[in-house]
Amino acid sequence: MCGAPQTPDADRELVLTRLIDAPREKVFRCWTDPALLKQWFAPLPWTISHVEMDLRSGGTSLIVMKSPEGQEYPNPGVVLEVVKNEKVVFTDAYTKAWEPSAKPFMTAIMTFADEGGKTRYTARALHWTAADRKTHEDMGFHQGWGQCADQLAALAAKI
């Protein structure tokens, strides 16, 4: 059907949604302010040791996760789209300057919508293959991203 919205195959997509008791401007700010992102983006006891974000289409992103044992895991990517207070889209398919990554894994789409004075937060992870999706799910997508969403909600409520 012409004009119908296209959605990825369910076998390649993971979705998490939360109703956050905070205005979407605050939830969006928690996603786009590096100092705030560092406070919630890793499931505790993991932390974020470094954040670089150029929040424009084509801008580079680097988020470094740190394990409780001190091992660091850099996550480079490129920002694809930013709509203030509505959407953030990024991918690991590219690194800085549109250089293809060695192993593209996913594109992430975060949306923020008003819902009864709160924010409907939806995080979609779109994977290149069903195997990548399964790997991400087996790594603890629902638990890890769920814990991060809870940490995001707590931070957005207090800023």
Residue ranges of model-derived segments:
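Short, solvent-exposed aromatic-acidic interface loops
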Residues: 93-97, 124-131
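Hydrophobic pocket/interface hotspot
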Residues: 27, 37, 61, 79, ...
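Hydrophobic ligand-binding cavity/cleft-lining segments
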Residues: 1-47
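Hydrophobic-ligand binding "helix-grip"
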Residues: 38, 42-43, 49-57, 62, ...
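A conserved amphipathic terminal alpha-helix motif
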Residues: 128-159
